[in-house]
């Protein structure tokens, strides 16, 4: 239950609700019973993630990109799983791996890249997404 509380506390209030229409604020109104119920469903194996609400977000080039908006409970479960997996695998990651890591950022990655380019011969750079 503590991890579900931690996961909930990391959710952003201003994000759009998912398919169920429930906001983080709505979920907070009955937080303790909601988290207890969620935990019981996880333990029983009856928790099922909901479909994401699909929104098309306009891009600068005039096209759109699809965005899936998860409901609050799914975000809580996803965040809890991230916290568990980070504890397990963080020790195995390379120090120069910056993507989606706690305490690491794209700005730090760019700074490190700048140092490498300035101090070593670089024959190629790969740009990947």
Regions found by a protein language model. Name each.
Residues 1-128:
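Conserved pre-catalytic core of RNA-dependent polymerases
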């Amino acid at each position: 239950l503590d991890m579900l509380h931690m996961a909930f506390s990391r959710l952003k209030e201003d994000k759009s609700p998912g398919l169920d229409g429930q906001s983080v604020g709505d979920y907070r109104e009955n937080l303790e019973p909601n988290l207890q119920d969620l935990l019981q469903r996880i333990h029983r194996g009856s928790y099922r993630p909901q479909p994401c609400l699909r929104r098309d977000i306009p891009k600068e080039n005039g096209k759109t990109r699809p965005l899936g908006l998860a409901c609050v409970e799914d975000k809580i479960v996803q965040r809890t799983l991230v916290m568990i997996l980070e504890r397990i695998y963080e020790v195995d990651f390379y120090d120069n791996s910056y993507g989606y890591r706690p305490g690491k950022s794209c700005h730090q990655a760019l700074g490190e890249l700048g140092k490498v380019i300035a101090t070593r011969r670089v024959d190629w750079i790969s740009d990947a997404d």
